[in-house]
Amino acid sequence: MTVPTYDKFIEPVLRYLATKPEGAAARDVHEAAADALGLDDSQRAKVITSGQLVYKNRAGWAHDRLKRAGLSQSLSRGKWCLTPAGFDWVASHPQPMTEQETNHLAFAFVNVKLKSRPDAVDLDPKADSPDHEELAKSSPDDRLDQALKELRDAVADEVLENLLQVSPSRFEVIVLDVLHRLGYGGHRDDLQRVGGTGDGGIDGVISLDKLGLEKVYVQAKRWQNTVGRPELQAFYGALAGQKAKRGVFITTSGFTSQARDFAQSVEGMVLVDGERLVHLMIENEVGVSSRLLKVPKLDMDYFE
């Protein structure tokens, strides 16, 4: 027997989490949903091309939809919990979900962007969600493009969520890894983390040449609020103290308009917000891996 589609996992995941006010480990939610759906051993053994178990993958996508609907959240790595809105929804819907309710949760919030913590930045504030009937009428190529977009969006949300949970020192290392993948520094050792007490607002230094004559200074912050002009002025002062010509300020949050105006008014300062950082990590496969899917296409020249 085949494993039920991910939309069928939405209600079991939702109902199980409603019994766990302190949250539950994702692996426990996977098993509870599989039990609720009556999956046998053969169904639980099925895997997707990446090697992940199908039922765990579909339970994960069900939880993704609940998060986008504002009904659930990830408290930490591998721990899920309903939001107050989620508990309210379950309390007001004691009867089994109708097909219409399931479809609404499965498809209406596909492109809603997650904001995993108050200090996170919205990755893409506005986008239209495709109707499930519209998707059903789409060509396979269109559905493939939409699926790829959903996967990228989901990974982007997960990357940002994990960035917000790592230690400040680990975040600084990650930022330097990203900059190295972008081509800064001939060798990874050319990018040095210097953050710590008395760092003067400098978290990393990149040597652009072997003698270290040309350097880029980096500030990497998991900011709890939008970064304003005062923070950039302090960073600019730290750059001046190093007689530096170039500086990069990277944050998981965003920048105020005043901060951006200040950065444009001085030479050599580049700003990277959470959205840009996440997409740089995805594009350069820092903390992210990818798999190749071969899509067949007829070679007309061969038959001529």
From Swiss-Prot:
Purpose of the protein: Involved in the acceptance of foreign DNA which is modified. Restricts both adenine- and cytosine-methylated DNA.
BP term (GO), one: response to hydrostatic pressure
Pfam family, one: Mrr_cat
InterPro entries with a match to the protein in the record: Mrr-like_N_dom (IPR025745), Restrct_endonuc-II-like (IPR011335), Restrct_endonuc_IV_Mrr (IPR007560), tRNA_endonuc-like_dom_sf (IPR011856), Type_IV_Methyl-Rstrct_Enzyme (IPR052906)
Keywords from the named record: Restriction system
An example Gene Ontology CC term for this record: bacterial nucleoid
Taxonomy, superkingdom: Bacteria
Single GO molecular function: type IV site-specific deoxyribonuclease activity
Region called Disordered, residue ranges: 120-142
Record protein name field: Type IV methyl-directed restriction enzyme EcoKMrr
